[in-house]
Amino acid sequence: DAPQHPATRKGAIRVELEQRLQAASVHGVRAIVVRAGDFFGPQLGNSWFSQGLIKPGRPVATISVPSRGVGHQWSYVPDAARTMVELIERRGTLEPFARFHLGGHWDEDGMQMAQAVQRVAQRHGMRPTLRDFPWWLVWAAAPFVTTLRELLEMRYLWREPIRMDNARVTAVLGREPVTPLDTAVEATLAGLGCLG
């Protein structure tokens, strides 16, 4: 399991919720906790992918890169859902409070996801450019926009690589379902209305 020393308010809430589930498991409640990277997928409107990397509902013209040179973990929602279903199907063999990490897609240098979006868009006749995400603008507007303040709280995820180990989920399931990156990105862009 990963160390539980949250540095943010959201992290503290997550830890408290997990502690409550663990305490309830002593009294017969069964819980499976699955931790994953940044979610992306078709029709997923509230995600970094759909709100930070690209603009939904239009062809991909630019791709905003949040942090070049810093690894980042991504989880394709259909893969995460499939993994969760498979874990639930095995719940009788798991301890009452079971924790798992998903490996998903590891973006080694912070560019692989953006480059996958670029490749897929190019296959559909677009010529998107890569640009750095405007963190300066987020800092400037954050005092006036709650969502941007919340975004800044999570910026550490783009400043330091955090990679979860999926050894436990692969030990239980035999493998972790992972759709090839370009296939997952193409389905995501299509679902977000970016491919026409």
Residue spans for each PLM region:
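Conserved beta-loop-beta element that borders a ligand/cofactor-binding pocket
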Residues: 19-43
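Short aromatic/basic micro-patch
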Residues: 33, 74, 107-110, 163-164, ...
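A conserved pocket-lining segment of Rossmann-fold NAD(P)-dependent short-chain dehydrogenase/reductase
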Residues: 54-75, 79, 83-86, 95
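Conserved C-terminal active-site "lid" loop/helix of NAD(P)H-dependent oxidoreductases
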Residues: 77, 99, 138-176
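Mid/C-terminal beta-alpha module of Rossmann-like enzyme folds, strongest
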Residues: 83-151, 179-196
